[in-house]
Amino acid sequence: RHAIIKVEESEEEISLLNCISEKQGKFTIYNSLLSEYGVLGFEYGYAMTDPKSLTIWEAQFGDFSNGAQIIIDQYLFSGEHKWKTQNGLVLFLPHGYEGQGAEHSSARMERYLQSCAKDNVFVANCTTPANMFHILRRQLQAKYRKPLIIFTPKSLLRHPMVTSKVEDFANGGFKLVIDDNLANVDKVNTLVFVSGKFYYDCLLYTSPNPRDGQISRM
């Protein structure tokens, strides 16, 4: 929706992400048909055929990962153990009841976490844009391939507090833990671990001044 712009006079479509550098890789984006089982099977095969490409499949908001559950269970979670083949496919799964009713939470965190075993997959719930950038970058920088599942709540797309500094993108790497810089470290008596959208929910009920409770992002 926002990756492609169109020239009004010529109807030419321009992908800005393909205009960053002459030495960059190729960026393509497609609207896939609503056959999650077939589409995710194709993406799994594409990622296996070209392990140097960052292949990402985003489930539509509305519990549409259900239709692809066979691929997720039989291939993503267990493929390496059964067939000794690695795969670096990335899944963006919308998460959370965000005012749309019971059928609008594509990713049940507990279900995906229960399927983690023997280093078979990465499951992430990123809190900052920079951390999400670094985990995607790490996906290709690594010398091996593992599936990566990222929970992507829609409410964070335009949240005014979900920002990162430019230097956070340019430096460092993926952080497993992000400390709370608003806490008074000398007076902390309560430590709360949260991740993703829950961190920003917590901020609504805390004071902007240094406090005696620390909220650490996992």
Language model features by range: what are they?
Residues S216-M218:
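Hydrophobic alpha-helical segments, chiefly the membrane-spanning helices
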Residues T85, E98-F198:
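Active-site phosphate/pyrophosphate-binding segments
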Residues Y205-P210:
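Conserved small/polar residues in nucleotide/adenosyl-binding loops
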Residues R1-K52, W57-E80, D168-I178, V185-L204:
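Non-catalytic terminal/interface segments that mediate subunit docking, oligomerization
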Residues N18-G25, T49-T55, N87-H95, R111-D119:
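Short acidic (Asp/Glu) and glycine-rich catalytic loops that position anionic groups and cofactors
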